[in-house]
A protein has these predicted regions:
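Histidine-acidic metal/acid-base catalytic patches
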Residues: 1-118
Length: 118
């Protein structure tokens, strides 16, 4: 069994971003994070709203860094996306931007790690 880790949901619960890191620290080493999707929110239940990655409760770089160092080897994708004018119903433009953002974070972390070892 494993957890579909909704990073945005953990962030919007009371405790905010701390919930994300607690979950990574607990489930990551146990290899129970099998799939993760990332969205950002500002605020917590009952008053929160979805926002673009990097504009909300958590630092996306820190989350991806901790995921990569926890033993997570599953899928990491964007989740719900904020709408922008001129985009299609499914938010293709924002999904593309979120995917590029996440990929950029992963590449930056990998390059940073390679520089440490050089």
């Amino acid at each position: 069994w494993g957890l579909l880790f909704c990073i945005g949901t953990f962030s919007q619960m009371e405790g905010g971003a701390r919930n994300i890191f607690d979950a990574i620290e607990y489930f990551g080493p146990r290899k129970k994070l099998v799939y993760a999707h990332m969205r950002d929110v500002q605020g917590t239940v009952p008053r929160f709203r979805e926002c673009f990655l990097g504009e909300g409760n958590f630092n996306p770089f820190e989350v991806v860094y901790k995921l990569m160092h926890s033993g997570f080897d599953g899928f990491l994708v964007s989740d719900h996306v904020s709408g922008i004018e001129g985009d299609r119903e499914w938010g293709h433009k924002v999904r593309y931007a979120d995917t590029a953002y996440i990929k950029g974070l992963m590449e930056a972390i990998e390059k940073m790690e390679a520089m440490k070892q050089a």
